[in-house]
C-alpha cells in the first residue's frame, strides 16, 4: 500500500517562501502566521494587531508588512467587502466557500453551494487555469430585515 505524502505545514511553506525570496525569518513574522492559523474566520489588520498584543507584541506596521508577505506566499486570502477595511482569512485548510455580505450592518457569513462550485469547476477558460474563486453576494441579513420591519410597523 502506498503512503501519501503529508502536506507541508503553513510554517514550512512560509520558511521555504522566505528563503526563496531572500527575506529575513523573523520571530515576529512566524508569530503572526501562528496567530492567523490558530483563529477561525475572517480578520482585519487592526483586529490581528490587537490579538497579537496578548501574546507577542508587534507593531501595526509589522502586521501590515507581514500580511503583504503572507498574501504573496499564498498563505492568506484578502477580501475587500463593499468599502469595508480589508478582511483576510487563512488559505490553507479551508474549503472553497462564498460570502454573503449585509449592506446594512456589514455582517459577513460564509456559505457553500455545491452547484456553484461544480459550475466553476466545469467552466473552461481560454488560456487560463483557475486555482480558486471568490463569490460575494450582497444584500440585507435577516436581523436587519427584522429591524427595518419593526421600525416601519412603529411608524
Where are these regions (language model features)?
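Short acidic, hydrophobic short linear motifs in intrinsically disordered regions
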Residues: 43-50
